[in-house]
């Protein structure tokens, strides 16, 4: 095998990891899932999950990736545990699944850049969303988005990905921050802040009964699977992405420090997007929960239609969202591409193109009808993501064990105690929390009948 590429700089890796993490998950999914599933309650569970489960799980993925120096599937084999390859396969499969509809939403974003410039949505933001979010329009833009992703991945790690992500995070923070300030000045926004930021403690409850299987009830049953999986989704966990990215990292770098940076920045961007979108929904009189997948697009389009220089602001905003979406989508495609390139020694550009084509095909139903998109998304949240993260934690916690601590500590000045605590937590509390998430997800999936595809 030829010499593996590595990141040019330490900042390169952090930026790419942040670039992978910050994406439509934060800007599109987070506000709409928050407004659909309980507002501040969702926020509390999400933040707790990001720190309490996401951080340890991210460290687990970093360790697997750096130690093995290989792609997300090959890694398990190289670490001497062939039987655990299924975890990698599940992760890569989950990434494949998610990218198929992620790309459809990326296509919407492309459309909204144009729609802002021409003012096409100014007259009727809601009906505009309805007409461009499904059907032939959406399909064509889904194809264009996927082509862009393929082009960047084909270029290789340093040239393509590293360069594309450097400017993105600062621009996102600046634009979202400015919008948040503007929203704050609007009348009618305040109930939005209450809904988003002040949790009703009575909603944070969950009860369990055993007859004979555990069955849960209470307000949190619905919130947990979505909020915890939202943390996984937005941190790019359970899809082999962080394994793959960490495989390009040197032994002299502190994985611990890097992962904290990623978690904090990522959650901050999500909350910032929430501070823009949720109060806006209230200003516009949209009932929380009824915004759906169009919440971001409709609420912001309505806002841009009212703003002075709205066309320009809108176009710039959606352009930045596009960059965020691209840098995330790149890392999803990179996972599969790197597996095929490592394993079969095939040429990177060709592999990226073929895989991109397959993912495009898988996404066609979602582009055609948003009911399919919702179905793909629900299955990812309630089943695939928690299952896949569970696999990673079981592997690192119970199978790989001690060597993982050594790998974690390499390149950092942390003491053994921190490493041992991490491993112990990953083995116990964190795994239990993921099990609960999975159980609740599957429970609601079957109770609602949401497993049945919308044919
Ligand atoms: N974390 C990305 C987002 O929030 C999505 C993603 C998941 C990207 C997994 C890569 C890998 O949009």
Regions found by a protein language model. Give the residues of each.
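Membrane-water interface regions at transmembrane-helix termini and the short interhelical loops
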Residues: 37, 86-90, 144-168, 244-252, ...
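Transmembrane helix-boundary motif of multi-pass solute transporters/channels
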Residues: 9-49, 204, 258-260, 265
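C-terminal membrane-solvent junction of multi-pass transporters and transport-like membrane proteins
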Residues: 80-83, 87-90, 344-356, 379-437
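Membrane-interface "cap" regions at the ends of multi-pass membrane proteins
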Residues: 1-28, 57-62, 66-79, 84-86, ...
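Transmembrane helix-loop boundary segments of multi-pass membrane transporters
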Residues: 29-47, 160-166, 291-295, 313-321, ...
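Helix-loop-helix connectors at the membrane interface of multi-pass transporters/channels
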Residues: 4, 108-133, 246-253, 257, ...
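Inter-helical loop and helix-membrane interface segments of multi-pass membrane transporters/permeases
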Residues: 33-37, 73-90, 103-154, 158, ...
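Membrane-embedded translocation segments of transport machinery
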Residues: 2-4, 171-326
């Amino acid at each position: 095998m030829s010499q593996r590429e590595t990141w040019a700089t330490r900042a390169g890796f952090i930026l790419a990891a942040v670039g992978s993490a910050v994406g439509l998950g934060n800007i599109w999914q987070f506000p709409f899932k928050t407004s659909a599933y309980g507002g501040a309650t969702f926020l509390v569970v999400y933040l707790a999950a990001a720190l309490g489960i996401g951080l340890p799980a991210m460290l687990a993925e970093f360790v697997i990736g750096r130690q093995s120096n290989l792609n997300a599937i090959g890694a398990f084999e190289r670490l001497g545990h062939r039987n655990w390859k299924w975890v990698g396969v599940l992760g890569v499969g989950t990434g494949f699944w998610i990218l198929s509809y992620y790309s459809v939403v990326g296509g919407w974003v492309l459309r909204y850049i144009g729609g802002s410039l021409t003012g096409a949505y100014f007259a009727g933001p809601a009906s505009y969303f309805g007409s461009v979010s499904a059907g032939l329009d959406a399909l064509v833009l889904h194809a264009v988005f996927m082509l862009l992703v393929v082009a960047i991945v084909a270029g290789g790690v340093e040239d393509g990905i590293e360069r594309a992500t450097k400017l993105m995070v600062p621009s996102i923070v600046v634009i979202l921050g400015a919008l948040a300030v503007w929203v704050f000045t609007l009348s009618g926004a305040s109930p939005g802040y209450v809904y988003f930021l002040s949790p009703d403690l009575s909603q944070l409850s969950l009860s369990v009964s055993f007859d004979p299987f555990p069955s849960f009830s209470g307000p949190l049953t619905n919130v947990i699977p979505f909020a915890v999986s939202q943390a996984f989704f937005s941190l790019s966990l359970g899809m082999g992405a962080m394994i793959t990215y960490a495989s390009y990292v040197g032994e002299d770098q502190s994985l611990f420090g890097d992962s904290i940076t990623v978690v904090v920045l990522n959650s901050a961007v999500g909350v910032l997007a929430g501070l823009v979108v949720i109060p806006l929904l209230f200003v516009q009189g949209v009932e929380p929960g009824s915004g759906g997948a169009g919440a971001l697009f409709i609420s912001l389009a309505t806002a841009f239609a009212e703003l002075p220089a709205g066309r320009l602001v809108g176009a710039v905003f959606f352009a930045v969202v596009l960059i965020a979406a691209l840098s995330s989508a790149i890392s999803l495609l990179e996972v599969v591409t790197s597996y095929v390139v490592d394993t079969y020694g095939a040429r990177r550009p060709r592999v990226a193109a073929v895989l991109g084509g397959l993912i495009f095909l898988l996404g066609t139903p979602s582009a055609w009808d948003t009911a399919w998109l919702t179905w793909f998304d629900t299955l990812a949240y309630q089943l695939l993501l928690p299952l896949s993260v569970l696999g990673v934690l079981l592997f690192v916690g119970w199978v790989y064990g001690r060597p993982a601590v050594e790998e974690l500590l390499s390149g950092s000045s942390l003491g053994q105690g921190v490493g041992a605590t991490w491993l112990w937590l990953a083995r116990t509390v964190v795994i239990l929390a993921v099990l609960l998430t999975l159980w609740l997800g599957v429970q609601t999936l079957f109770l609602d009948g949401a497993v049945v595809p919308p044919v």
